[in-house]
Amino acid sequence: YVSYVRLKHNGQFKTNLTKDWVNIVGEQYFTTEKPGFIWKGKTAMFVARDMYLADEGRLIATILSTINVVDIHGKQQYDESELLRWLGESGWFPTNLLPSEKLKWTAIDNSSAKLSFDYNGLSLYYIVHFNSANEILEMETKRYMNEKRLETWIVKPNNYEERSGIIIPMQAEVFWRLKEGDFSYAKFKVTEIEYNRPEKF
């Protein structure tokens, strides 16, 4: 079982669905026994920190190294959104997706299932689609775009490879499925990943 994960990635990111892509590099740390993560992403313009720590979700964006232009936390919508991110990125540490008291799978058909996760008063779910190799193709849920707007949010892992004896996706794309269409805003490629190393890179 994986208890800790640390990874590095590169890729592209959009700060707004109507903005251009910017290059990004990041590193991320996960805990599994108690849900938690810290992600730090750097672009030429800003540094973003996304996290779920001590059962609280938080997003901080900084420019010029010291000026916080975004600091969002303290509401259940953000706690739920960041916990959804943690769960949606479990493909990088798939023992996290084994059935437990908190996590249940319900078959839908031969290639899809509902993943339910109950934790700290929050009830989350994903509709998960698999390919013929039983690799996750897509995870779909409802996530808050802001405090009041709940929309369809999709994680698409791909390019599966073996790392430390575990088959994981080395790339992932994230997008919103809105009535106007699908809007991708993050494309990450894992460049380094290690398990059960709780210390910082």
Where are these regions (language model features)?
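Short, hydrophobic/aromatic-rich segments at coil-to-beta transitions
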Residues: 3-8, 32-39, 108-116, 136-138, ...
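Short, solvent-exposed aromatic-acidic interface loops
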Residues: 41-47, 64-70, 142-146, 173-179
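Flexible, processing/modification-adjacent segments and terminal tails
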Residues: 61-119, 148
